[in-house]
Amino acid sequence: MDHDYEKLGLKVGLEIHQQLNTKRKLFCNCPTKIRDDEPHGEIERVLRPSQSEMGHVDKAALLESKKEKKFIYQYYNDSTCLVELDDEPPHDVSPEAVDTALEVSTLMNMKMADEVQIMRKMVIDGSNTSGFQRTMFVSQEGFIETEYGNIGVTSLCLEEDACKKIEDGKDYTKYCVDRLGIPLLEITTEPDITSPKMGKEAARRIGTILRATGKVKRGLGTIRQDVNISIREGARIEVKGVQNLDLIEKIIENEVTRQISLNEIKEELLKRNAEVVDEIKDITELLKDTESKVLKSALKNKGVIRAILLKGFSGMIGREVQPGRRLGTEFSDRGKVLGGVGGLFHTDELPKYGITEEEVTKLKEYMNCGENDAVILVADKKNKVERALNAVIERAKESMIGIPEETRKALDDGNTSYLRPLPGAARMYPETDVPTITITEEKLEAIRNNLPEMPEEKLVRFVKEYELNEDLAKQMVMSYHVDLFESLSKKYSKIKPTLIATTLEATLKEIKREGLDTDLLTEEHLEELFKGLSEDKMSKEAVPDVIKGFIENPSKKLDEILEIKGMSSMSVDEVESIIEDIINQNISQVNEKGMGAMGLLMGRCMAQLRGKADGKLINTTLQKKLKEKVQ
């Protein structure tokens, strides 16, 4: 849907969270490696909120504690330690991570803190074993340049990443601590973004700056974007966990649509003098003989069915607020998160789900539901139903006031769902186990004198110096292999840089699409490959098959791979001899077609010589030998 974003007063700010590719974690010497093999053990914890330095308890933390969940943490003996398990004090902050934070701050024109104080940010959703995340403020008041103008950067913080979620059960959540403690940059922009396209461009530009350092991790989950969105007649909404850059635009568009729709619903409810009745009624007896599978299942498990009356809400609960999501979905989200129920039913969508028209009529009569009213019912354990319906009552009342400020989760379709209330400042307090870090002018001067080349500068250089076309140069500049490309191109000047670039960017992707695990291919393998190519041990046509050979046999050397694949390079004399044999074997076609037999013969030559000789050599030799025969 097209909106006039200027008229609506759209304001968007970004929070970019980027993992750093450091040798060690932020507060211990463990590697920053994510694992998927079997863990060596587990521990269990229960977390509770504590007061901030000012004596307040954060409402988001309080909400999490009410879920009464236990947390299970998986660990590895050889790559995680007692620091991650919160059984040992944190070590000193990683100097490499601090230097990277200062480098990125400089590239974004920011003012550095003289002294960095480590803080604790309360987080009791289980994603941190300690119940808090360690974070430190590094710099502020910077800006980035985009095609839409400058966008202010509020702050840059260096913090530890959270645990990796493995499983979410009804009364427990399981995490792995391998990700906990990986250094993470949090970059927060000013709300200077005024359109969805500008939001995407700002995130792209920050990502470009981060990648220019060569010190950030790549791949899914290594960068996460949170988007803060508001319009003039709306509220600030924080959307968490946007992992795809292309999704940012749609997230902003859909949130604006949602806020406009919720405002329209509010106006309609006020016209109707709508009212939310606080009383929760037990309707278990009324629907005890229902054939609805959901309701029968709840009753079979000793659950209850309860309902609330929303006066003036008829037709409103089923109204769409985002593509495929309705006001009823907003109510359901609250019930699911705060009550732990599977969902709810409302009379805008009934009869349905096995609930008959007769049962709906009985329900409306029992609830004194008028023509313009609506009923919401929930079936589950008594305590869950009570919590869920109280949450729905609160959300229904908010729908008559406007748009509640809240944190929402990004969904893959560009929509969002309720996560928790917006957190406040009450969850921050100083870290007492780690000393502060002094940022000296000498340190900053050293950083300024060693800033990386920016991608736009590198692009121009790659086109000029390596003679790459612009599309391939753009791919290479943004590639994880950019440093390897430059190293190989300089070391093996006999090989065209275009071949090295296409191998790293196109060939590896094609091989991965075939189902082979390209993660098994190391830089040492690629180094050996291009060294062999420069020494004429193989032809360039053999490159894909040799790469596959390394993946299939990671411990083998190039000579062994060439032998396994039957691709050892031939001498010119051997190539000429084989081509002469092929011409003689097809002499009748040569006599009939003359030089017109070139295509047929080339195919047969390549079938026998591919990977063993350079394609150009095969072509020129065949042309020469064929001309000799024809003449």
Curated annotation (Swiss-Prot):
GO terms under cellular component: cytoplasm
Top-level taxonomic group: Archaea
Catalytic activity: L-glutamyl-tRNA(Gln) + L-glutamine + ATP + H2O = L-glutaminyl-tRNA(Gln) + L-glutamate + ADP + phosphate + H(+)
GO BP, sorted A to Z: glutaminyl-tRNAGln biosynthesis via transamidation; translation
EC number: 6.3.5.-
Any one GO molecular-function label of the UniProt entry: glutaminyl-tRNA synthase (glutamine-hydrolyzing) activity
Gene3D superfamilies membership: 1.10.10.410, GAD-like domain, GatB domain, N-terminal subdomain
Database matches in PROSITE patterns: GATB (PS01234)
Alphabetical keyword list: ATP-binding, Ligase, Nucleotide-binding, Protein biosynthesis
UniProt similarity note: Belongs to the GatB/GatE family. GatE subfamily.
Subunit structure: Heterodimer of GatD and GatE.
Function: Allows the formation of correctly charged Gln-tRNA(Gln) through the transamidation of misacylated Glu-tRNA(Gln) in organisms which lack glutaminyl-tRNA synthetase. The reaction takes place in the presence of glutamine and ATP through an activated gamma-phospho-Glu-tRNA(Gln). The GatDE system is specific for glutamate and does not act on aspartate.
HAMAP family noted in UniProt: GatE (MF_00588)
Protein name: Glutamyl-tRNA(Gln) amidotransferase subunit E
Annotated source species: Methanococcus maripaludis (strain C5 / ATCC BAA-1333)
Organism lineage string: Archaea, Methanobacteriati, Methanobacteriota, Methanomada group, Methanococci
Gene it is expressed from: gatE
